[in-house]
Amino acid sequence: MKKLRLYVDTSVLGGIFDSEEPKRVNTAERLLRLIGDGTYEGYISRLTIEEILAAPGKIQKKLQAKITNSGFSVLEENAESVNLADAYVNAGAIPEKYRADARHIAIGVIHDLDYIVSWNYKHMVNISVRRLINSTNIRMGYNSIEIISPEEVTGDGEVEI
C-alpha cells in the first residue's frame, strides 16, 4: 500500500515548542515519530527552512535537529509553484500579506502530495480557503489537495480513532 505523503508546514513544527499547550506538543511530536518510523512520508520545503532560520537561535537549532532526525525530504519552490501561489492570492483564497501560506500550499500541490498538515486555521485549515484553493487547482489543471490539522493524522482528537 502506498504511504501517504504529507507536507508539514512550519506551524506544526513550531508546535513542538508550545509551552502553553502540552497537547499540541504531544501531537507534533507524535506526527514526527510517525514520519520518522516510516508510517508516512514527510515533506517540508526550502520555504519552511527559511522560516525556521528566522526563529530564535535556541529553537532554530532544536527544530533543525528534529527535522533531520525525522527524515523529512525537502521540496524546492519553482516558477510553477510561485505561479500557483499567485493564483491563490488573486482568487482571494489567501491574503497578499500571507503569501507564504499560499506558497506552502502550492509547493505541496505541484509535488502532488496527499495532504498539507497545518495548525494555521485562519489561512489554511479552513473550509472556505480549501474550496478556493481546490477550485483554483482544478481550473489550473492540478489535483485537489486536502489541508488538514495534525490531529487528523495522529488521531489525537477528543474522540478515540
What are the residue ranges of the model-derived segments?
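Non-catalytic, well-ordered alpha-helical scaffold segments
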Residues: 29, 46, 102-106
